[in-house]
């Protein structure tokens, strides 16, 4: 089993537990150059809010999308959009990634934005 298969297996386990809770899920995906965040509804699995470093407004603020500063910017943006959508509490789905670096920076920025985990 390689590194990616292990990550996907961890992600499946986490998603199953979050599904039992029935909470809105904050799903994070990271690549080498970008980071993506989505709020997904528990019932019909539809995306309520999304933000990524590919968006024009974010690209103008940051130089490179694959670092901690970019993750912090995305965390703040997703928190603002979540509040507009009426979401105040979420379950954090880190997609099998370690809670470290960019994933941690995004999560902390979302918490600072007023969203509860």
UniProtKB/Swiss-Prot annotation:
Protein role: This is one of the proteins that bind and probably mediate the attachment of the 5S RNA into the large ribosomal subunit, where it forms part of the central protuberance.
GO cellular component term, pick one: cytosolic large ribosomal subunit
Keywords attached to this entry: Ribonucleoprotein, Ribosomal protein, RNA-binding, rRNA-binding
Species classification: Bacteria, Pseudomonadati, Pseudomonadota, Gammaproteobacteria, Legionellales
GO molecular function: 5S rRNA binding; structural constituent of ribosome
Ribosomal protein found in the keyword field: yes
Entry-linked Pfam families: Ribosomal_L18p
UniProt family annotation: Belongs to the universal ribosomal protein uL18 family.
CDD domains reported for this sequence: Ribosomal_L18_L5e (cd00432)
One GO process term, biological-process aspect: translation
Keyword Zinc-finger recorded: no
This protein's name: Large ribosomal subunit protein uL18
InterPro entries per UniProt: Ribosomal_uL18_bac-type, Ribosomal_uL18_bac/euk
Alphabetical list of NCBIfam families matching this protein: L18_bact
Species assigned in the record: Coxiella burnetii (strain RSA 493 / Nine Mile phase I)
Subunit structure: Part of the 50S ribosomal subunit; part of the 5S rRNA/L5/L18/L25 subcomplex. Contacts the 5S and 23S rRNAs.
